[in-house]
Amino acid sequence: MPDKSPISYSIDIKRLPQKGFPVTVKPTEKELAALAAEHGLIAVGSFEAELLARDWKRTGVIVTGRVRAEIVQECVVTLEPISALIDQQIEATFVPEGSPLARPADPDGEMFFDLDGPDSPEVFEGDKIDVGALAEEIFALAIDPYPRKQGAELPSAGDGQQQSPFARLRDRLS
């Protein structure tokens, strides 16, 4: 997770109720602007994470829920602003540092991942987990890295009339 999230919201895991602790993360306008700047967006119109933190296997915590956001990005072809919606499910497991439930390091330095299996638990220190940073991480992973306006097309290479600078240099040297 990011070191310092623009939408930090820590929960005390020592005091989780048996039914879980519901959390709604809804950033201020200033935090939305910081979130947009952090992720190279034109704007973040809205952002909301509805989460539930519950005890998991005595010492761990499982956080489930959903992140929804409205963002404005720049089209990679036309450079025009385009709107997009983000709606992502969250399920993340946390275990305390030194827990036997954390993924053990392989002594040979190799790690094996089951891409279809559940994610490995994340390790935390202390008594708090930043669920705001978790929501931001899920948000960041859902952003389209190459947004394209509907119908936008890259210009064609043409019929070869314009020669690249390297081709012109090659012609001069030969």
Predicted regions and their residues:
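Acidic and generally charged, gly/proline-rich low-complexity regions
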Residues: 1-174
